[in-house]
A protein has these predicted regions:
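Short acidic catalytic loops
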Residues: 49-52, 143, 150-168, 428-433, ...
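Active-site-adjacent "subsite" loops/lids of carbohydrate-active enzymes
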Residues: 95-154, 187-202, 400
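Aromatic-lined carbohydrate-binding/catalytic grooves of carbohydrate-active enzymes
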Residues: 37, 42-77, 101-126, 154, ...
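N-terminal small/glycine-rich loop or linker at the start of catalytic domains
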Residues: 6-24, 119-127, 275-289
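N-terminal structural segment of carbohydrate-active enzymes
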Residues: 1-59, 91
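Short, solvent-exposed turn/loop segments enriched in Gly/Ser/Thr/Pro and often Arg
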Residues: 18-20, 50-59, 97-104, 160-171, ...
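Carbohydrate-binding surfaces of carbohydrate-active enzymes
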Residues: 2, 9-11, 40, 72, ...
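Active-site mouth loops of central-metabolism enzymes
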Residues: 20-32, 128-142, 290-298
Length: 726
């Protein structure tokens, strides 16, 4: 088995050059020269290059024996030339292979095609993209033969597989046949998360994808001991695309463009799941996607590369070959070089410390990337297939919780079912609308609270099993929550009315916070509020207020109490937030998913422009009350655009705190003062603080609780603090 010449996992500065170019015009790629490209890579200061073996066109860039080579190359092996020249100049080679997006295969083998339910989207008539199905044995054989050939022939240092997901629900004969063989039933025609048959199909799609990628990785590992990864970007968006953490764990590292979701949230998820590191890939310039993407070097560094540095990760810029094979030399020689020169001093910190550490874990659930309002939708419904931005309450709640706690400087990480045996590491765990839960998850969270953990849960968390409705139509965690479910109500707007001083003070000068749309227009989606019956020893923290009418109201029907809004009118005693002791721990359960109601990062209602962080303030106050008064791993007193990521670099007996200044909008300006507090691991004491990478000593004090305090002045982009402990 061939070993790599270069350690790809230690390559900080990388690039991907898109080359999805057809061959029906002899002018295409006429000016492309792999030797000239490697010369530009070297001038940019790159350490690794991801280059194409094929593209979404399905045409290969090496003389393949299976499939078809791009004919404008006239047999020139640009894959082989690129690998050899990269290695000669001291750079790593990462192969790119497009999986199910393959126009050549779609055209020549109709029986391999992915058939979207309703024939919409990629793969339908008139689309530029031809997609094939992972359940097609013929296509799998074709794909594995190509992968086997290319990994035997060339000495890659890593390989990346793009488009490992289901872009639509496939109803091809291959999928129908496989589901019939496995379940004895036909494919369901509509979504129904309470129906065992639908759940079996949804679960099967994920399993099929996992099995397909395992076969791909097995093919590579027969030939080369190199890192393998795919495009992880689709994972946190929707159940429809079929990815899950089992598939992510098959990979040696994780990569993708995380701008499909909140950047910080995406990094948190992937950093917690990855076996090694996370490669953030983002378009810098060139014809990417729908149009030309151009961004200045300074903004590129702040908005993209700086996130990578904050998470001790590589950054991969994305350029695109122009159709004639040209690129901008200035981009490589000047613009890209400026970005990478700023990164280079931190090269030695790549991958240091393992996974981020924190006091609060926000739970991400593959199974809950759905929504109850999807029940009854046909598989071709546009409301189902229009997945961006994500509409799942769990996803919006997970992002909202990350955003609210990040800007309030609460130490957080994202956790998944892979960490179910490690829950005791966290003082507080957040379950944002985790609607579908397995028996293993139910038991793990019960034990966590029973043994002293603190839990926040919202909405329909634990209502459904992986196979449908839970017995008794009640929460699986009802005993832990301290309440039973009476029903689910849908409100255009509801109001949370705090009943204890701590929460009243958190939202002052407000007396209530709105859940949903307090104004008459424009229309907003309805919000779910669970009706609950608390047990006797449960404390009610907040109750429900409702507007004059559930309907929008008009001049004619008089169903409103104020022309501009729908303010509280019906004051109830119905509990919406409760606190309950369970074993040695406690739970705050909220009928409304406060974490989903976060105001945008930029501030303000997108329609009116006036910020209201009421739900965010209430949510943060609840989490801080669960944390209690004991010192946290770290805390900052800083602007909204400043955040920190902490690592326990136990090999060097030090905590590493990466403090980044990424404002909501460019330009980035230095922050005059950031106050920092750091707490050593249990049983340890902080002995010294140093600023990395130079190792300059920092002045600090230590209080009676062992918390080290220091200050960072004029934070421009990044400050890395090493807290040595013993």
């Amino acid at each position: 088995m061939r070993k790599p010449q270069f350690d790809y996992l230690k390559c900080q500065r990388q690039i991907l050059v898109d080359m999805h170019v057809p061959d029906w015009d002899p002018g295409f790629l006429a000016n492309f020269d792999p030797i000239r490209m490697v010369d530009l890579y070297q001038k940019a200061g790159l350490q690794a290059v991801m280059h194409y073996c094929n593209s979404h066109m399905g045409l290969c860039y090496w003389p393949c024996t299976v499939g078809e080579m791009n004919k404008v190359l006239k047999g020139r092996d640009i894959v082989g030339e690129t690998v050899a020249e990269l290695h000669r100049r001291g750079m790593a080679s990462c192969a790119y292979y497009s999986c199910i997006f393959n126009n050549w295969a779609w055209t020549h083998h109709p029986e391999w095609r992915l058939v979207p339910a309703g024939a919409v989207g990629e793969g339908s008539t008139g689309s530029r993209y031809g997609t094939c199905c992972f359940n097609s044995e013929g296509y799998n054989e074709f794909m594995h033969q190509q992968i086997d050939e290319v990994t035997k022939k060339y000495e890659f240092d890593a390989i990346f597989f793009d488009m490992v997901y289901w872009p639509r629900i496939c109803v091809c004969d291959n999928c129908k046949r496989r589901f019939r063989q496995e379940s004895g039933a036909e494919l369901p025609g509509k979504v129904e998360w309470t129906d065992p048959l639908w759940c079996k199909f949804a679960n099967s799609r994920e399993r099929w994808l996992n099995e397909s990628f395992k076969k791909i990785t097995a093919t590579v590992r027969q030939n080369a001991a190199i890192p393998i990864f795919n495009n992880a970007s689709p994972h946190p968006i929707t159940w429809l695309w079929g990815n899950n953490v089992e598939e992510l764990r098959e990979q040696d590292l994780l990569g993708g463009d995380f701008r499909l979701i909140d950047m910080f949230s995406g990094f948190q998820l992937f950093a917690g799941v990855s076996k090694s590191t996370v490669v953030y890939m983002n378009a810098f310039t060139g014809y990417i996607g729908a149009g030309s993407c151009v961004i200045s070097p300074e903004d590129q560094f702040v908005e993209n590369a700086l996130y990578s540095l904050a998470f001790n990760s590589p950054f991969m810029a994305i350029d695109a070959i122009e159709s004639n094979g040209n690129v901008s030399a200035k981009f490589y020689e000047e613009d890209l070089r400026k970005v990478f020169d700023k990164m280079k001093p931190y090269e030695g910190l790549l991958g240091v410390g393992g996974k981020p550490i924190a006091d609060v874990g926000i739970y991400f659930s593959d199974a809950s990337r759905m929504a109850l309002f999807e029940n009854g939708l046909s598989l071709s419904d546009e409301d189902l297939n229009d997945v961006l931005p994500p509409t799942s309450p769990h996803i919006t709640g997970w992002v909202g919780a990350n955003r609210a706690l990040r800007i309030n400087q609460v130490p957080i990480v994202t956790i998944t079912k892979l960490q179910l045996k490690e829950l005791s590491k966290f003082r507080v765990i957040i379950l944002p609308q985790v609607v579908r839960m397995s028996d293993e998850e139910i038991e793990a969270f019960k034990n966590y609270v029973r043994d002293g953990g603190k839990l926040y849960a919202s909405g329909a968390t634990s209502l459904l099993t992986m196979d449908g409705t839970r017995k008794g139509n009640n929460f699986g965690l009802a005993e832990v929550f301290g309440c039973s479910l009476e029903g689910i109500d849908y409100h255009r707007v509801a109001y949370v009315h705090p009943q204890i001083d701590q929460l009243k003070e958190a939202i002052t000068p407000r007396s209530v916070v709105a859940h949903g749309a307090p104004r008459h227009s424009p229309p907003h989606p309805t919000k779910i509020t669970t009706r609950i019956r608390p047990v006797a020893d449960t404390q009610v923290l907040a109750t429900l207020d409702l507007p004059y009418s559930e309907e929008p109201g008009s001049r004619e029907d008089h169903k409103f109490s104020s022309i501009h809004a729908s303010p509280p009118w019906r004051i109830t005693n119905d509990p919406v937030i409760i606190r309950h002791r369970y074993g040695k721990g406690e739970v705050v359960y909220s009928s409304v998913d406060l974490e989903c109601d976060q105001a945008p990062t930029l501030g303000g209602d997108p329609d009116m422009g006036h910020p209201d962080y009421g739900p965010s303030l209430l949510f943060v106050a609840i989490i801080k009350s669960l944390l209690g008064d004991a010192p946290v791993t770290f805390s900052l007193d800083a602007d909204i655009g400043v955040f920190a990521v902490a690592y326990d670099d136990s090999q060097n007996h030090r905590l590493q705190l990466n403090i980044a200044n990424i404002p909501p909008l460019p330009p980035s300006r230095p922050v005059p003062l950031v106050k920092v507090a750091l707490c050593a691991p249990a049983g340890k004491k902080i002995k010294a603080l140093k600023e990395l990478p130079e190792g300059s000593p920092m002045l600090f004090t230590v209080d009676s609780q062992g918390v080290a305090r220091t200050e960072v002045r004029d934070l421009k982009h990044l400050c890395v603090i090493a807290a040595e402990y013993a």
